[in-house]
Curated annotation (Swiss-Prot):
One of its GO terms (cellular component) is plasma membrane. The lineage of its organism: Bacteria, Bacillati, Bacillota, Bacilli, Bacillales. Disruption phenotype: In the absence of nitrogen source, cells lacking this gene do not show degradation of TnrA, which is entirely soluble. Homotrimer. Under poor nitrogen source such as nitrate, the complex between GlnK and AmtB, which are the transmembrane ammonium transporter and its cognate regulator, respectively, interacts with TnrA. GlnK-ATP complex are not able to bind TnrA. This is Sensor histidine kinase GlnK. Residues 1-15, 60-71, 124-139 are extracellular.
Amino acid sequence: MLITVPLAGELKFYPLNEEFRVSFGAPVFFFFLSLLRHVPAVLPGFLTGAAVFIFRVFLELWGGGHNGLTPILYDQASGFFFYMTYACLFSILKANRFRERPIMLGFIGFMIEVVSDCVELTVQFLIFHTVVTPEKITDIAVIAISHTFIVMSFYSVLKLYETQSREKQTRQQHEHMLMIVSNLYEETVHLKKTLKTTEKVTNDSYQLYREMKGKDVQLSGRILRLAGEIHEVKKDNQRIFAGLSKLISNESLRDYMRASDLLQLVIRMNEKYAEALGKQIDFYCSIEGEHDEYHVFIVLSIINNLTANAVEAMDEEGMVSLRLRKPNESMVEFQVEDNGPGISEKIGDIVFDPGFTSKYDEFGTPSTGIGLSYVKEIVTELEGDITFDNQQRGVVFAIRLPVRHLIQKG
């Protein structure tokens, strides 16, 4: 402010008399004051007025043509009073409280500039006995309106940029939270399967205990203790499952989203994933027909798994295409296609088996191999089916699900 305002003040003209200048210093000063949050406007006003005064005196001395320092000081004194008056009125009226109301802020800025110009003219009248007429006041008002328009234009552009940046940040946080909750949803599915398994093992152990009770007391006792330990594991898993379910249900996120928004969300997340892996992947999206809002976490956990697998399977460059259509009114079909290496025929029968993987890191460590098995499990649980079809280059995964499991009930 202390540098910009004096420099902007040199873009000037003299519409009223040889002493009263109109420059871009006033709108620039107004713009800076409107950005201040916690600093009282009086202090910046005093410092800016002093900086403008000193800068103008220096320029006059540098240019020469004056009879000593005193006339120069008189010539430039009125500018200091303009900025001081401007800052004091800005502080008294607490103009910054209207930061979110640009029209009101602009009106206050207009009034402040008119009053400050009148103070400057008054100082010049006291020093140089210049004449102040109603026509001059009218000219001042017109100039103040133009200054206010310029400042409010820049201010509105700045506020728009801030709003867009805030909206982008909020969207990124929302997408990140959706991804976290989607991953938690995936873990609850695995945990639910574990609960069923431990329940079955507990029952089988207890039945074995009852069969061995009359035959081998020592062995039956060990079996009973084992059944009890498994039962404790089951209860621990139940507590974890309940906590995860509560956490997912309590998140202030939408459970249902438009199909187009869901697929775009998958694409944005996997664009970042591909970039993190150092790969150049082009993503495409195609939606046929009309679709309801679908369950966010079900769709994300399925489609994002398949899309991430496609990204991982490709080399440096590739293409992934997401398609959505309705074969009929009761079914919806998602397709994930890539132009990667595809799936060889000899592993086609075991590709959905838990633990199977064809992906290894740079150290030769295999991945967990639970992604496709999870997708298969959740699709089966939703009464759907999943298939894959090798193309000339790449593979297409097709997931068909009943619409009733994806849309909001009622």
